[in-house]
């Protein structure tokens, strides 16, 4: 049987040891930074596809969730729509119709394009924020 030993760079080990028990609070801060960037891009894209007849209710319900711990132990943050609407319809349903269209109404994608457009900027901002948080410790 073969053995394999992996040695991490000393600098990385020092940074990881600094985090220690503060990993949860640091990861929340980092996720909120990335979530804010994606939220801004989704909001801008949604504004660009909405018609002048829009009530603004969908745009007003767009927001960021709290950072939650998933079943697998990963921290998650979500960009989404608050419920319910004043007319009884679901904001998620309205957003889905705008994103994918329906019979007689063409699709006006805003979520998929926001994800694609904000990915690089989000990763860079989260990386920078993580390094800032580690340096504070």
Predicted features along the sequence, with ranges:
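Short, Lys/Arg-rich flexible segments
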Residues: 1-77, 86, 95-137
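Extended beta-sheet lipid-handling architectures
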Residues: 79-81
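Long, charge-patterned amphipathic interaction tracts in eukaryotic proteins
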Residues: 88-90
């Amino acid at each position: 049987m073969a053995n394999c030993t992996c040695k991490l760079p000393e600098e990385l080990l020092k940074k990881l040891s600094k985090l220690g028990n503060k990993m949860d609070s640091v990861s929340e801060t980092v996720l909120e930074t990335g979530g804010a960037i994606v939220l801004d891009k989704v909001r801008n894209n949604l504004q660009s596809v909405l018609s002048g007849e829009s009530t603004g209710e969908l745009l007003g319900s767009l927001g960021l969730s709290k950072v939650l711990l998933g079943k697998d132990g990963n921290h998650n943050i979500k960009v989404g729509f608050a419920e319910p609407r004043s007319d009884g319809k679901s904001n998620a349903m309205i957003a889905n119709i705008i994103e994918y269209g329906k019979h007689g109404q063409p699709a006006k994608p805003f979520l998929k394009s926001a994800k694609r457009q904000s990915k690089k900027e989000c990763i860079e901002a989260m990386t920078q924020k993580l390094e800032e948080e580690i340096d504070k410790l």
